Amino acid sequence: QGRAPHPPIPPAP
């Protein structure tokens, strides 16, 4: 609502 949904972060190796 106040914060925009962040894009999915790929898992680091």
From Swiss-Prot:
A GO CC term attached to the entry: extracellular region
Protein family according to the UniProt entry: Belongs to the bradykinin-potentiating peptide family.
Subcellular location: Secreted
Annotated keywords: Hypotensive agent, Metalloenzyme inhibitor, Metalloprotease inhibitor, Protease inhibitor, Pyrrolidone carboxylic acid, Secreted, Toxin
Biological process, per Gene Ontology: regulation of blood pressure
Membrane-spanning parts: none
GO molecular function, one term: toxin activity
Summary of the tissues where the protein is detected: Expressed by the venom gland.
Protein name, UniProt field: Bradykinin-potentiating peptide 13d
Role according to the record: This peptide both inhibits the activity of the angiotensin-converting enzyme (ACE) and enhances the action of bradykinin by inhibiting the peptidases that inactivate it. It acts as an indirect hypotensive agent.
Statement: the UniProt record of this protein carries the keyword Secreted: yes
Top-level taxon in the UniProt lineage: Eukaryota
Record-listed Pyrrolidone carboxylic acid modification sites: Q1
